[in-house]
From Swiss-Prot:
GO terms for cellular component: cytoplasm. It comes from Aromatoleum aromaticum (strain DSM 19018 / LMG 30748 / EbN1). GO terms for molecular function: S-adenosylmethionine:tRNA ribosyltransferase-isomerase activity. GO terms for biological process: queuosine biosynthetic process; tRNA wobble guanine modification. This is S-adenosylmethionine:tRNA ribosyltransferase-isomerase. Belongs to the QueA family. Its main location: cytoplasm. InterPro entries: QueA, QueA_dom1, QueA_dom2, QueA_sf. The gene is queA. Transfers and isomerizes the ribose moiety from AdoMet to the 7-aminomethyl group of 7-deazaguanine (preQ1-tRNA) to give epoxyqueuosine (oQ-tRNA). Pathway: tRNA modification; tRNA-queuosine biosynthesis. Monomer. The keyword Cytoplasm applies. Keywords: Cytoplasm, Queuosine biosynthesis, S-adenosyl-L-methionine, Transferase.
Amino acid sequence: MSLTLDDFDYLLPPELIAQAPLAERCASRLLVLDGERLDDRGFCDLPELVQPGDLLVFNDTRVIHARLYGTKETGGHIEVLIERAIGPHEALAQVRASKSPRAGSRLRLADAFDVTVLGRVGEFFHLRFPDSHDVLDLLEHHGKLPLPPYIDRSADEHDESRYQTVYARERGSVAAPTAGLHFDQPMLAELAKKGVHGAWLTLHVGAGTFQPVRVNDLGEHRMHRERYVIPQETVAAIAATRAAGRRVIAVGTTSLRALEGAAQDGPLEAGTGETELFILPGYRFQVVDALITNFHLPKSTLLMLVSAFAGLEPMRRAYTHAVGHSYRFFSYGDAMFITHRNDAI
C-alpha cells in the first residue's frame, strides 16, 4: 500500500484543542480501540482494562526549562529553544532572530549569562555555556517551560507541575510524554494493588516532535533522532511478562519508540542509544502489545505510528468518533487505549 501525507489528514475544530489541563489528572476521557470496536470510557477506568501480570512501561523523562530569551551583541532580540544538552556546558538549540547569529558571536540570555555560538549542527546552533554552571542547572533557574506551539498562551505556575508526569525524574525533554500526564499517585497505587507491574525507561523528547512532515512522499521523510536509556530491569520485566503470556503496554509513543527502536537489530537489550525509527502502516511491532496515547496532530508522524499500530481505517474511524464526540485533543487532552492488531495495515 502506497501512502501519502494526505492519508493522515483529518478536520479538527480548533475548540477541541485543549489549552489547559483538567482539574484532576485522571478526569480525562479514554477512547478504547480494540480491533474494530470503540468504547467511550474514562481514564479512571484504566484498572478495569488491564490484567494482573500486565506490564506498563513508563517514560520517566522530565521537561526542562528549555526556552530562553535574550539579545545578540548587536542588540537584536532572540528566542532560544534548547534541543538537547550534549555535555555539562554545551547544547544544541534552535535560535529565532531577525538574522542568524554567526559562529564565534556571543548571546546574552535571560539578562544573566552569555553563551558562545560555536557553529551549526544540521538545523541547530551549537552553543557553549559558561564553565561555572551546568547547562541544565542554568536552564532550571533562568529558562521557561516550553509549552507546545498549539497552546496559545504562556506557561504559568500551574503548568510547572501539570506539564510533568508525577514520576518524572531524568531531566532532558523539551516536551512532556503526554500519555503519562493522566496518571496520579492513587491511580498508580490502584494498578499496583491489582498486580499490574511497572517498568521504566528514559527517552528525551526533542523539539523535532513538533516539526511538520514537509514531503507528500513519506519515503522521503527523515525522522529526528531521540536519545533513550533502557535499564536491564526493564528488559528483564518485559521478558518475564512475555513468558507469562501477559501484555507489554507502552505508556505513550515515546516509550513505544524507545522499545521498538532498541529491538530493530535483534532482541531487546538494555543500554543507551538513539532512534530515528519512522513507523508507518506495514511496520511489524516487536515488543509492544498495547498502547496508551493522546490524540495526535493531523499529518504527524505520531498519527502515522498509531495508525500502524491499530490499522489505518480503524484509526480513521476512531478519530472521526473522537471529533464527533468532542474529545479534547493533544498534550492536555484526552487519551486512547489501543490494542495492537497483528493484521494492521
